[in-house]
């Protein structure tokens, strides 16, 4: 299990893995019917935010990887290869009907790097689509927040 908090004892935000947890078992929103597609996110909040932006569509699996480990932006990125995520490997083993992977990582260096790595690793066996947020540096949570603020503003203007 992945732990994330606003503040630690020093007043800084923190992220950590719960001791003894198993990355194979990750947050997943199943489709209401049958589906051959899985959308893959860095975090569960991204999956829920993207689902909100898609008006609650339940036509695909939405799987969180519980974070990604990317190299720092710079020279090292060309040589480092990403390990296949345990959560996605286990999911695909358990769902052989899945033929399409939609990569919905963040649109920052780490997310773009992970998207390219995962596409390369899975495109021989699956149809792989990169679906990053259109805004540079954003994740789907940022876009959902923007959409909510826009909706509030429009409602306020109509109420005048």
Task: Report residues per predicted region.
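TOPRIM fold recognition
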Residues: 52-160
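Phosphate-handling DNA/RNA-contact segment within nucleic-acid enzymes
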Residues: 1-94
């Amino acid at each position: 299990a992945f732990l994330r908090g606003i503040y630690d004892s020093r007043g800084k935000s923190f992220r950590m893995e719960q001791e003894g947890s198993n990355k194979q078992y990750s947050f997943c929103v199943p489709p209401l019917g049958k589906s051959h597609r899985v959308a893959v996110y860095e975090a569960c909040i991204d999956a829920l935010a993207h689902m909100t932006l898609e008006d609650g569509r339940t036509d695909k699996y939405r799987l969180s990887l519980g974070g990604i480990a990317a190299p720092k932006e710079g020279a090292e990125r060309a040589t480092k290869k990403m390990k296949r995520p345990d959560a996605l490997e286990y999911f695909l083993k358990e769902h052989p009907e899945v033929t399409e992977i939609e990569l919905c990582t963040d649109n920052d260096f780490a997310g773009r790097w992970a998207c390219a790595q995962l596409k390369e690793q899975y495109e021989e066996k699956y149809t792989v689509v990169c679906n990053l947020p259109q805004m540079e540096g954003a994740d789907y949570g940022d876009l959902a927040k923007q959409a909510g603020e826009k909706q509030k503003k429009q409602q306020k203007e109509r109420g005048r």
